[in-house]
Amino acid sequence: MDYDYDSSDLQYDDHKQNSNSKLDTSFRLFRTGTMSLFNNVVIVDFTYTPTSIYSCQYTIIDLNYKVLETQNILFSKSTNEPFNDKMDQINKMICDSIDKLSGRVLVLSPQSVNIPLLNLPMSVRIFDFQQIAKKKKIPLKSFDQFKDYYKNKKLNVDFKFTILSLFVDLTKNFIKSDFKFPSFKPILIDIKREGSLEGFFGHYIFTNIEIPIAIKNLINGYRDHLRENKLLLTQPELEIIDQQQEEHQQLQQQLQQQQQQLQQPQQKSEVQQKSIVENEENPPSEMESSISAPPPRRITPNELLDKKKRILFLKNLKKSLLLKKHQLNHISNPDAENDFSEIGETTPKKIKVLNLEKDNNNNNNNDKDNIYLEKDDSPTKENNSNIATTTNTNPNTNTNTNINTTTANNNEIANTDNNVNNVNQVTDQGDIKYHHQELIRQLTKLIRFEQKSLKTDSNNNNDNNDNIDDNNNNINKISPTPLSTSINDINNKNNTTNITSSIPPNSTNNNNNNNMNTIPLGTTNNDNIITIPLDTTNNNNNNNNNLNQINQNEFNHNILLQVQTILDKTILNQQYFLNEINNLSKRFDNMQIQFDSIYSKIKSNNNNNSIVNNGNNNNNGNNNNSIIDIQKKQKELLEKQNRILVLKNELQKLESQQEQVKLENDKDKIRDSKERYKFTGNKYPKKISNNNSSSSSSSSSSSNNIINNNNHQIDPYNTYQQKQKTSLQRRPPFNKPNTSNVFIKTKFRPINHSVSALPQKNTIMSSFRNFLKSFKK
């Protein structure tokens, strides 16, 4: 946009030119927006001749309209000091003056040529007016106006005045309150190699004219000097170039590896086709046929039944886990609604582990059959190129046999790290809900997988022949066990990581799964993590037996034991506080006795001194000191009393809470007993709830009104009398049922799987939570 300058905007007297203590009164820096982020502004400018640099000037301005420091440095031609050393001194002076300032500093430079000469740290924000003006496409008339204005002012006389006036003009015409000061990188500066010398010699602050070749050589020589001597305070340009080259090489290596991986399956398929053609042309002899691998073993009907049993067991286990999650949601949030979709605030990262029955020819794995394991490790570049494969094969098997393979691509191993043994640990130790959610999800995956394997086995039985050797027991078959995973040792020689799940194969020749992490039933890694046992057997029979031996009641009992341990800890804490209160009360009593004795002695001494020596100043001074000591002790005793009172109040609150919990438990027991034992018949009518009482009374009144309408005799007191009669008909007394067999006299009620047996809002855990909140306060 075009704009004109008024003479009233920039009028400087001789006094203002020389004094530089303040800026023009009409100029105001913005105290809002991005300018308010900075505490000081440094304006740096260089003046040039056709062949060299003439001078350097910089000023430091405070946002309170004050000039803190001004410097004008001339490059004298008489001295033999080289240009690079002179520039090093100037940069050192600017850095020293910036170090004295507090807060963030904004460095302004009116020309793009000045910025390569500055060697400032990365913490300083450098801003170039000329680049921003060109990006905003400001018309050239404005530059011409700047040139004419500063040319007429004869800026060579006073350099301080030029910088201040420049800053005022630029902030008035270009900078707004919401203007963003972009960070500047010296590498992005592109100084043109060819340029004209015309119009550059007027000491113009703003120029869009080409730079002379001599000045280009000076600037480039100074940058080379900084690089060679490693004097750059910013990140060196050579290091950035090296990093870019390394990244380019890494990308090329990754592309080559991917191409090799794509070529490998094609080569395998070609080799297989050649072998098939050779077998057709040259049939194998009797010896070769005996050595070759036999067809896969036929699966017996007992094994199919075992698989069906296993699927049923997994489904039942999933249901029980859903119930436990439902109960845990009640315990943690009794007031909230039960929503199975809520897992938690944090979701840990996961590793994809493949452990499926796949043919060797099928290289594409579906995500539905993948088992995800928890892992909270950041991806590293070292493991991106590694490919982990662990195979359990038999040399006597055919290509159609099911082989236990675990493969992972580059993207799947990107999340692995050296700390791979920590997979069994849940990231948030207290997040039991998420742990149960993960177990349920893994169970669903296993159930799907078992069902698929059942279908494939049944199909294979129909296709295979009956006359098959029984010597093929070494073929691997997957027998999954849920809820736990382990990772084998890392092969340091090949720089590859072997990732396997804890699903044991049937073959006894497999030695890779010997170091599995096993957790027995009822044990816990942490206080709040519930685990389920692993199956480490290598035979199918032992596998199925161990799976069937898991009892759901034991799992429930483990959860109750964990809750009981938490409550026991709270009781121990309560006893500890009681002991502390008793000790403090005893100490308080002893201190009070000492205080009384000291106070009585001092009082007697004061009386004696007043009778004997009324005018003795020394005794009065001693008495004053003793009174001050007494007052100090009184204050200490009062503070201790207040502490004891606070602790007693907390004790009373705890006792009241315990009584409320007991009463609520008793009420729950009585209510449950009444609801379970409702007697029917004329003698013992059913219990009528409060909601039904109003409806029954209304129905009775309506029936009475109908009778009265039929008889045409309306009695206003008739309905009231009938209500009174019904209220007088009380329930006959009956003996309470013997609840000794129903309720077990223990601290905790046995948990049923039905929804009615779930804990209510006012339970032990809710009171326990309130108890913990009182301690936090």
UniProtKB/Swiss-Prot annotation:
Q: Does the keyword Coiled coil apply?
A: yes
Query: Which cysteines are cross-linked by disulfides?
Result: none
* Skewed-composition ranges (Basic and acidic residues): 357-380, 661-678
Q: Does the keyword tRNA processing apply?
A: no
The residue ranges flagged as biased composition, category Polar residues, are 712-729
GO CC terms on record?
nucleus
Q: Which GO terms describe its biological process?
A: regulation of DNA-templated transcription
Q: Coiled-coil region(s) at which residues?
A: 237-271, 629-678
Question: Signal sequence: where?
Answer: none
* Alphabetical UniProt keywords: Coiled coil
Disordered: annotated span? 263-303, 357-400, 454-516, 656-741
Where is the sequence biased in composition, kind Low complexity? 263-273, 383-400, 459-476, 484-516, 688-711
**Which domain of life, per UniProt?**
Eukaryota
The protein depicted here goes by the name Putative uncharacterized protein DDB_G0289041
Q: Which organism is it from?
A: Dictyostelium discoideum (Social amoeba)
